[in-house]
Curated annotation (Swiss-Prot):
Organism placement in taxonomy: Bacteria, Bacillati, Bacillota, Bacilli, Bacillales
This protein's name: tRNA(Met) cytidine acetate ligase
Keywords noted in UniProt: ATP-binding, Cytoplasm, Ligase, Nucleotide-binding, RNA-binding, tRNA processing, tRNA-binding
SUPFAM superfamilies: Nucleotidylyl transferase
Entry EC number(s): 6.3.4.-
Length: 405
């Protein structure tokens, strides 16, 4: 069976995602679609609106055959680490082809960009360091260094989210020496961060904004997604946003010694002082974020730092986990086709499959981190509901889609 790998967040799953999944499967001639999905916290440092289980079901309802989780040590990371973790897991599941959405739908420019960057990596790193000394953020320093090196060459710009991720998928495949073909599918209409909500195709950013404003989003998402969102809101009386976690972050920053705060992943250059000082003038998470943000510290970097603060994740812990790569594959859900694929190929997978949360304890620091992060996600719930969800996480089996439909 030819397995297609997709790297996703589905926050939430919308019509643009459905188009990508359908077209990617058709374009690659795949027999099985494997989605590796961020779990509770996402690449840009945001809590997922809905739990991994609801989002996994959205994917299965739309045609994914296997949904597995991208561990926290890779999901709340730079594009490079994010891509490396995802590609490693897809390779472990014997995916022979990876597909991602892009503005032009052409893969050749991504390979050309990867080749150019391989040839100029030393000079690129040097220029990035020089620009960082000027006090700009890492993304801006990278974009400026790339612009300086590329000159008049017709290369993909490295200042668009989909280009950055696509480039890093190709780079990860090459760096890890994996036998996997990278392909890309043309994105339709809405851009990655478009904030306007109009028509059947809207960005996840616009859909989240509409959802949190109480607007109807049914024209922009599959019917099953809309039903699951309503079910989630009725059950938990929230969609997870940073505002729900603000009191816990306040407590953490105000009661933790500065020397300990400085050990948090993404916290460097005395940022712990800025976090505490700006907190005194903030009455909301957004107020705190605005007061802390600067030319050097972008919203994305700060949000990742906040995720690490909330979950007690240190730079040392992440480095230790990443050093040996993903240790297991956490299975969230499967279709009948996915189940058949696992049965026929399980012995050749290069990583073990985990089907219950309790099994994570076998995987040392990586497993313990995931257990902690999973519990932190439910902190906004009232005490009794929090206890129920933490218990439920240990009882939850992978979703068997046909049996639920």
């Amino acid at each position: 069976m030819r397995a297609l790998g997709l790297v996703v967040e589905y926050n939430p799953f919308h019509n643009g995602h459905l188009h990508h999944l359908t077209q990617a499967k058709q374009q690659t001639g795949a027999d099985v679609v494997v989605a590796v999905m961020s779990g509770t916290f996402l690449q840009r440092g945001e809590p997922a609106l809905l739990s991994r289980w609801y989002r996994a079901e959205m994917a299965l309802a739309a045609g994914a055959d296997l949904v597995v989780e991208l561990p926290y040590a890779y999901s709340v990371q730079t594009a490079e680490r994010f891509a490396e973790g995802a590609v490693t897991i897809l390779a472990a599941l014997r995916c022979s082809v990876l597909n991602f959405g892009s503005e032009k739908g052409e893969i050749a420019p991504f390979y050309a960009l990867a080749e150019f960057m391989n040839d100029h990596q030393v000079a690129f790193n040097h220029h990035v360091k020089q620009f960082l000394k000027d006090g700009v953020s890492y993304p801006k320093a990278s974009a400026q260094a790339f612009s300086m090196l590329s000159g008049h060459e017709k290369l993909l710009p490295l200042d668009q989210p989909n280009n950055i991720l696509g480039y890093h998928y190709v780079k990860a495949i090459q760096r890890l020496g994996i036998s996997m073909e990278a392909t890309t599918t043309l994105r339709i209409q809405a851009g990655y961060h478009d904030k306007e909500f109009a028509g059947p195709i809207a960005s996840a950013t616009a859909i989240r904004k509409a959802l949190l404003s109480g607007e109807n989003i049914e024209t922009a998402v599959p019917a099953h997604t809309a039903r699951l969102i309503q079910m989630y809101k009725r059950r938990y009386r929230l969609l997870h946003t940073w505002e729900h976690y603000f009191p816990f972050l306040q407590h953490k920053v105000l009661t933790t010694p500065l020397a300990e705060l400085a050990k948090t992943a993404e916290c460097s250059e005395g940022l712990e002082h800025r976090l505490r000082d700006s907190l005194f003038s903030a009455s909301s998470f957004q107020g705190w974020l605005s007061a802390t943000k600067s030319k050097r510290y972008t919203q994305t970097r700060l949000q990742r730092l906040f995720a690490h603060l909330l979950t007690g994740t240190t730079a040392e812990e992440n480095a230790a986990i990443q050093q040996s790569g993903p240790a297991y594959i956490r299975l969230l859900g499967m279709s009948e086709t996915g189940k058949t694929y696992i049965r026929e190929n399980k012995k050749t997978f290069s990583l073990p499959i985990v089907t219950r949360q309790g099994e994570l304890r076998r995987y040392g620091q990586a497993g313990e981190q995931e257990l902690r992060i999973s519990q932190c996600y439910w902190l906004p719930l009232p005490p009794q509901a929090l206890k129920q969800e933490v218990t439920r996480e240990f009882q939850q089996k992978p979703i068997n889609w046909e049996k639920r439909s």
